[in-house]
Regions:
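Cleavable N-terminal signal peptides
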Residues: 8-9, 19
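Sec/Tat signal peptide C-region and signal peptidase I cleavage site
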Residues: 15-21
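N-terminal small/polar-rich segments of proteins
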Residues: 21-97, 128-180
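Short, surface-exposed beta-strand/strand-loop-strand elements in extracellular ectodomains
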Residues: 101-109
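Extended, solvent-exposed segments with strong compositional bias
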Residues: 113-133
């Protein structure tokens, strides 16, 4: 019986012994997302104004001012900006004092609360404005059209463009990039 009591005491002592200390390791997991801005569908749209002169041969401002297009884009940085640069409608045919071959206008690009503008009569791009986190439509429209001399319009094709730029803030909290 002593052997049985001794065995029971040994078994109890073995189970009551403190466990070995546990050791843990930790692995941190991290990643990042770069500030980016993108246009969907290659960032391209067309404003086809059709006939831009009145029956009397002068510029039809209403036809030009009706020009509108929609771009789709996004920016994932809270300090992203947007600006516009408008280039006049030009006919490469030579004009004379009685005729105009240029149409000037104001271009506006509206994305949420941001609405930068540029006039074709001003050199360079218009002022950049904050757009922040943005995903959606950018409505581009034309207004305030005019021809330099309010003269008759030269017949032919007129070509211009409106460049809308979305810019991320790649400095992560610094100053946004400036318009060219």
């Amino acid at each position: 019986m002593n052997k049985l009591a001794l065995f029971a005491a040994a078994a109890a002592a073995a189970t009551a012994a403190p466990a070995f200390a546990q050791a843990t390791g930790e692995v941190d997991v991290d990643g990042y997302v770069d500030d980016r801005c993108q246009f969907a569908i290659l960032g391209h749209a067309i404003i086809d104004l059709g006939e831009i002169s009145d029956d009397d041969g002068s510029l039809d401002e209403a036809a030009v001012d009706a020009g509108t297009a929609t771009l789709q884009g996004w920016c994932n940085g809270s300090a992203s900006t947007m600006w516009v640069e408008a280039f006049p409608l030009i006919n490469t045919a030579v004009a004379s004092p009685s005729f105009d071959n240029r149409v000037d206008y104001r271009a506006t690009a509206t994305a949420g609360n941001a609405a930068p503008v540029d006039d074709t009569t001003d050199a360079g791009a218009g002022a950049e404005v904050p757009v922040g986190l943005f995903n959606g439509d950018i409505l581009v429209d034309i207004s305030n059209s005019s021809s330099p001399n309010n003269a008759l319009m030269v017949a032919g094709d007129y070509v211009g463009s409106i460049v809308v730029t979305l810019a991320p803030n790649t400095s992560f909290g610094g100053e946004p990039p400036t318009a060219p």
